[in-house]
Structures are given as structure tokens and as C-alpha cells.
Curated annotation (Swiss-Prot):
Classification via InterPro entries: TM2, TM2D1-3-like
Source organism per UniProt: Homo sapiens (Human)
GO molecular function, one term: G protein-coupled receptor activity
Coiled coil: none
Gene of this entry: TM2D1
Protein family: Belongs to the TM2 family.
Topology within the bilayer: Multi-pass membrane protein
Domain TM2 residue range list: 118-166
Protein name according to UniProt: TM2 domain-containing protein 1
Record-level GO cellular component terms: plasma membrane
Membrane-traversing stretches: 129-149, 154-174
Regions of this protein lying in the Cytoplasmic compartment: 150-153
Function: May participate in amyloid-beta-induced apoptosis via its interaction with beta-APP42.
């Protein structure tokens, strides 16, 4: 009687074949071929906010004539419309992937603005120059005690008036409520710089 041929591989061979198949599948999906396939078919589109400088242009903010600050200034922040360059494809502020032609708004960029409360820089300087010896500048800025003291001492015999004029002109002394002066948006403003954790410090190179 002839021996029958085995109908399939033995148990060890079957386990080995399955293990090799699993390893091959993992190497294809996670290796360089899988990365190429993912980048070719499933690459996520870039957000418009992450575009590089030169790939978009932003409009100048609309300035309020009364406050000389952007009209939508809230919590020291305003937003301006930004337009991606033509032939740029990215996700807009609504999350929709869009191919831009240069005329569509892609995102709104936040810009810093100041809190003002009706105190004009020009008025403060004029009061300090002409009526500083009467304390009018201090009364205007919300310092009634110092204003009364200057009034009673004729501006500390003129010395206090001169010091106040310098401090107000340099925008060191401001309104008592902590707000900023109303100054022309594109005029001369004092910008205070501070060092934070994000400040880039360039190494000094000496010859």
C-alpha cells in the first residue's frame, strides 16, 4: 500500500511562514516604502497660519481715528486679514483645504495693540509745557495730590515742572489708570523691550 502525501505543511513550518508574513507586512508599512506611500497619498495639508514669510501678505489694520488703535483691539490683541500667495494650497481658518489665487483670505494674524482711555499725549505735553507750574499736567493724568502740591509750590519752584516735562515727553510718566497715551498709530511711540525666555541672545564675538 503506497503512503499518502501530506496534505499541508507541518505545524512548525506553518508558524514560521506566518511569522515571516507578519514581519514582511510590518516592514512594508512602517519602512521607507510605507513612508513613500504615505507621503504620496495621505500627506496632511499645511495650515495657512504655518506658511513661511513671503508666502503670504497681510493687510494693514484699520485704525480708529479716536483711539489711534486697530478697530478690533481687544485684550491688547487685534487681527488682520492675510492672503496666501497664488498657487498656494493650505487649510484656511475654517479648516478647509483651499487652492489660493492671491485674493482669498487664508487666516487672520494676531498683532499687538495698546489699551487707551482718552488721554492724549499731545495734550499732556502741552499742559506740562505751559501750565506745568500749576500742576495742570498731573491733574489731567489723574494725579490730583501731586497736581495740588505743584500748584501750592509753583511747580516746586520750577524744578518739578521741568522734571515732569521731561518725564512726560519721554512717555515715562503716563496716565494713572495704567492705560497708554493716544498717539498717532504711525507716529513716534515709546516701545519698552524686555527679556523673556523667547528672547534670542546673540553671542558677542570679539576680534
Amino acid at each position: 500500500m503506497a503512503a499518502a502525501w501530506p496534505s499541508g505543511p507541518s505545524a512548525p513550518e506553518a508558524v514560521t511562514a506566518r511569522l515571516v508574513g507578519v514581519l514582511w507586512f510590518v516592514s512594508v508599512t512602517t519602512g521607507p516604502w510605507g513612508a513613500v506611500a504615505t507621503s504620496a497619498g495621505g500627506e496632511e495639508s499645511l495650515k495657512c497660519e504655518d506658511l513661511k514669510v513671503g508666502q503670504y501678505i497681510c493687510k494693514d489694520p484699520k485704525i480708529n481715528d479716536a483711539t489711534q488703535e486697530p478697530v478690533n483691539c481687544t485684550n491688547y490683541t487685534a487681527h488682520v486679514s492675510c492672503f496666501p500667495a497664488p498657487n498656494i494650497t493650505c487649510k484656511d481658518s475654517s479648516g478647509n483645504e483651499t487652492h489660493f489665487t492671491g485674493n482669498e483670505v487664508g487666516f487672520f494674524k494676531p498683532i499687538s495693540c495698546r489699551n487707551v482711555n482718552g488721554y492724549s499725549y499731545k495734550v499732556a505735553v502741552a499742559l506740562s509745557l505751559f501750565l506745568g507750574w500749576l500742576g495742570a499736567d498731573r491733574f489731567y493724568l489723574g494725579y490730583p495730590a501731586l497736581g495740588l502740591l505743584k500748584f501750592c509750590t509753583v511747580g516746586f519752584c520750577g524744578i518739578g515742572s521741568l522734571i515732569d516735562f521731561i518725564l512726560i515727553s519721554m512717555q515715562i510718566v503716563g496716565p494713572s489708570d495704567g492705560s497708554s497715551y493716544i498717539i498717532d498709530y504711525y507716529g513716534t511711540r515709546l516701545t519698552r523691550l524686555s527679556i523673556t525666555n523667547e528672547t534670542f541672545r546673540k553671542t558677542q564675538l570679539y576680534p
